Amino acid sequence: MTDPQQPYFDVIVVGAGNAALCAALAAREQGASVAVLEKAPASEQGGNCPYTGGGFRFVHNGIGDLRPLLPDLTDDEAGRIEMAPYTSDDFRNHLTTVTHGDTRTDLMDTLIAQSRPTIDWMTAQGVRWDIYSRLSAVVGAPSVIPNSVGLTAWESGPGLINMLTTSCRRAGISVLYETEMSGLTQDDSGVVVGVVARDSDETYRIRSKAVILACGGFEANAEMRGKHIGSGWELAKVRGSRHNTGDGHRAAMTIGAQPIGQWDGCHGTPIDIDAPATGDIQVTDQMPRRSYTLGISVNLEGKRFVDEGEGFAEQTFVSMGRAILRQENGIAIQIFDSKARPHLEGRYGGSQKFEADTISQLAEQIGVDAATLAATMDAYNEQAHDGEYHPRELDGRSTNDVKPPKSNWAIRIDKPPFSAFTVTGGITYTYGGLKIDTNSRVLDSGDSPIAGLYAAGEIVGGIFYHNSLRAAGLMHGAVFGKIAGEQAARI
């Protein structure tokens, strides 16, 4: 028997990011009373969403189809934009390719089919949009804008959280900040009937008909990173929220939820060694260091350890981050010569760089053995090629006889001054999570729904494997958040 003195809501949503707030709004729209439990203080609300650019990948028919969603876009701007349709087949092919075909087809099909309807629904909930790469739309005639990420939330990730939170307040949804979910409660038949909540004053129970877990991954939990992703990852700096510590994973699996997906996989990237230990909205986006394809990367012994030119950085930055974290202290040094410098990302301008006219002098500055670094450089240059860099082409110029090889952009590093940048690995979010069905119901080990329990967002496993697809994360969070809210409210 439940205690009538315990607070009650029809639906409890754990988390207050994109997926969680979409779930809360969808449940409220169905007439349910809703409480949102946010572990973070109000100033840090939103999980990883505030650290994103707010981009959404969805099916559309080109710029004409998007105009109703962009009331601030002038006719003149729209007339100078070329944007091809983004079809269901495009979306399916892209997601299948980056996940090596491992993504769950049932979730993928639901994501794709519901992507545009969910964008329209979010618009009705008060979300405003901006055209992706809008600035380029006013300088060219016409401007060709990528079709795959057609829209971003107004004022990016922080703006999205602000808009969704405002809509929740207007809808009468209670948001309980600095309130942590420490466990799920069940009745005698195993139905989830609430949560154990903890704030600064007390631990107490909140009753409900349904609970939606939308509280992110476990990327900010060093112990879980080391256990599941592997040795070295406990050293990773966290690029997003410090509050995403796997609370939902642990609570759900304690009552029999089935784990699924690539638990040893995550989205990560090389970042500046001076990046903060956890996300900082002001600087996080300036920390990635992804021009490694144009030079060599060495560890603290002065030795290369990875194929820097295996592919474009957009395809390899996750594996590069993983490789760096396997090195001593999770540190690497990117080295370039003056031929490469004009091609480095602008973000390198915010780094502490080391610069010298000789490799020996550079080695002394970065604290590695000069003889070892010189031998590494000589072995590389002996097999490398003369010429200039063409960063947007896989040029095939390789050093196949050097171990490890460099498959592209193997240009001799021989024109001083030489520059070095110290980097480490940063983690954005994790891939492993809970198994759900297409109604966002959490499944047990026998693939049966756990009554009263739903999940959405990063906590869901089975969507991303090996790599992620830009702007698909926010989209799948919104799609399955909306579904979870609707389904939970109908119990």
Question: Where are the predicted features?
Answer:
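Rossmann-like flavin
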Residues: 77-141, 358-379
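Conserved redox-cofactor binding core of oxidoreductases
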Residues: 45, 60, 100, 104-203, ...
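Glycine-rich loop(s) and the adjacent beta-strand/alpha-helix scaffold that form part
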Residues: 199-201, 205-275, 474, 480-483
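Glycine-rich FAD pyrophosphate-binding loop
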Residues: 29-50
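N-terminal glycine-rich dinucleotide-binding loop that anchors FAD/FMN and/or NAD(P) in oxidoreductases
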Residues: 50-86
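An anion/pyrophosphate-binding glycine-rich loop and adjacent beta-alpha core
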Residues: 245, 249-372
